[in-house]
């Protein structure tokens, strides 16, 4: 399905029934990042797996900015009139989730997996690889990761949504930045999975489903 938001067509897949759950993928992938987990989660939620602008089946764009992607997500929630949403975002999706929570009160629980506040929050070797790849491809997706996000402690402090900040102990994101996010969002819970990397707690379908179900139950209204 597609919906028009902010001058683009935003693609999403929907399945299941129950409390709305929005899944937001990372950079360079699309809703299929969650394809396996969706079929478990649909037993408990109405699942919406979205493609961010410039990704998947959503409208291609020449420039990408997290602020635009968060505006898209806020508009998506408003147009579908989704409330008390559980939102799980991974990597770039977690950045979008945090910035969306600054814009709307429609999210009832935010699970932010492996987000960074600044480009420097990502591993140095990754930034070097991204620069080399961008020099050749000029990809908007790579440029986005090299220049953004630029989220401040003050901005995080405006979030009133119950938030769980998640990462792996072997993540690509500097653990100090992960901890700063958790410290800056009022009342946020921090979960760092020992031995996990940037994606290993997301890819196995049962692990992600169990994580979302556990946290949604903990924060049930």
Locate predicted features.
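Active-site loop/oxyanion-hole signature of alpha/beta-hydrolase fold enzymes
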Residues: 48-86, 210
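Flexible "cap/lid" loop of the alpha/beta hydrolase fold
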Residues: 95-103, 110-136
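Active-site nucleophile elbow and catalytic-triad environment of alpha/beta-hydrolase enzymes
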Residues: 140-155
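Conserved alpha/beta-hydrolase "acid-adjacent" motif
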Residues: 172-177
């Amino acid at each position: 399905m597609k919906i028009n938001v902010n001058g683009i067509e935003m693609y999403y897949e929907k399945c299941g029934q129950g409390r709305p759950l929005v899944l937001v993928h990372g950079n360079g992938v699309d809703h299929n990042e969650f394809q396996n987990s969706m079929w478990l989660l649909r037993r408990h939620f109405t699942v919406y797996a979205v493609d961010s602008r410039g990704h998947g089946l959503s409208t291609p764009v020449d420039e990408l900015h997290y602020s635009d992607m968060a505006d898209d997500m806020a508009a998506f929630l408003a147009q579908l009139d989704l409330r008390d949403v559980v939102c799980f975002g991974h990597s770039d999706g977690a950045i979008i989730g945090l910035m969306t929570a600054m814009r709307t009160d429609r999210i009832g629980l935010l699970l932010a997996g492996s987000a960074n506040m600044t480009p420097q929050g990502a591993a140095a070797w990754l930034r070097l690889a991204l620069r080399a790849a961008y020099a050749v491809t000029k990809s908007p997706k790579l440029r986005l990761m090299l220049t953004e996000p630029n989220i401040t402690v003050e901005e995080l402090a405006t979030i009133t949504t119950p938030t769980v900040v998640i990462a792996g102990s072997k993540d690509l994101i500097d653990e100090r930045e992960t901890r700063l996010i958790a410290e800056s969002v009022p009342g946020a819970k921090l979960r760092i999975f020992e031995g996990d990397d940037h994606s290993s707690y997301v890819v196995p379908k049962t692990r992600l489903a169990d994580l979302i179900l556990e946290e949604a139950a903990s924060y049930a209204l």
